[in-house]
């Protein structure tokens, strides 16, 4: 049975993964601190975005499915909220808008009834 030298392949493997994770050295061939570690090539079928989240364009892309966002739009119109970031409303924001709308329609009675 062959023995694996402790200072041989394990150190080389450690160095390999350390370089892939992104540690930079002064002898880097690119010469820029902007590119550290392995550069992942951009797929030509995916649009380039500043956020770096390719999956966000996949899920929340340009396609407009029928019936999408109508609940959020109605909630915004009722509560008077106008600003929407990138046309997206998260579940948390939607809950907050609905809660504010219900509290304003109650006139604060729910808070007074609890005390």
UniProtKB/Swiss-Prot annotation:
InterPro entries: PPDPF (IPR026754). Belongs to the PPDPF family. It holds the Pfam family PPDFL. GO terms for biological process: cell differentiation. Residues 21-48 are annotated as: Disordered. This is Pancreatic progenitor cell differentiation and proliferation factor B. Keywords: Developmental protein, Differentiation. Probable regulator of exocrine pancreas development. Residues 22-37 have a biased composition (Low complexity).
